[in-house]
């Protein structure tokens, strides 16, 4: 039997979250490849609303898939404000799960998430961050680690989405997370290289 693909691994987690009725939204490269440059990714970041009463149900459902996740790791993630992992030991695939905090940005991300097709082969859908929120979080991640991949992903989203983006929303949250300078540089570069008319920001 052929081993599962990363998309199949991700799909099994998405289907489980939906079967449990948990509110979630997917960000990271998984979402940016939908809005920007389509490419294979083995990186999925899922933000979920996980009441304490649902933690054990989630653990049991994920373990039934044959994946590793433990209640202690979820509790630690809650206390330390860090993600926990869901791991398929057979393939080595991993998903990073972020517990949604009661912050204005996290709440905005959930409210603005949208159901999108993430696999054109199967037409599978999931709730993804909006493209604007993908940009904001990639700005945050860039400031944390200075990885150029985040800037490339943002650039691809700008090129593909163009004037469909809410630039005022991005500017507001870029300021809130301390990324205004980086955002303005990316926007200026986009304007220089794009053949489209400059967005009204």
Name the predicted role of every residue range:
Residues 1-201:
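Compositionally biased terminal segments of proteins
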């Amino acid at each position: 039997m052929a081993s599962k693909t990363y998309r199949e691994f991700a799909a099994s987690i998405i289907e489980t979250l939906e079967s449990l009725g948990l509110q979630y939204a997917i960000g990271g490269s998984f979402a940016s490849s939908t809005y920007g440059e389509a490419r294979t990714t083995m990186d999925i970041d899922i933000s979920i609303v996980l009441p304490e009463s649902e933690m054990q149900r989630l653990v049991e459902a994920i373990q039934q898939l044959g994946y590793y996740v433990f209640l202690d790791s979820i509790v630690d993630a809650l206390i330390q404000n860090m993600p926990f992992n869901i791991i398929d030991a057979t393939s080595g695939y991993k998903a990073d799960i972020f517990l949604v905090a009661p912050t204005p940005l996290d709440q905005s991300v959930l409210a603005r998430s949208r159901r999108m097709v993430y696999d054109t082969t199967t037409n599978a859908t999931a709730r993804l961050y909006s493209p604007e929120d993908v940009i904001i979080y990639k700005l945050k991640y860039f400031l944390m680690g200075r990885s150029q991949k985040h800037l490339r992903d943002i650039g691809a989203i700008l090129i593909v989405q163009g004037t469909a983006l809410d630039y005022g929303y991005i500017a507001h949250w870029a300021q809130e997370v301390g990324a205004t300078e980086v955002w303005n540089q990316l926007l200026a570069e986009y304007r220089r290289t794009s053949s489209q008319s400059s967005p009204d920001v």
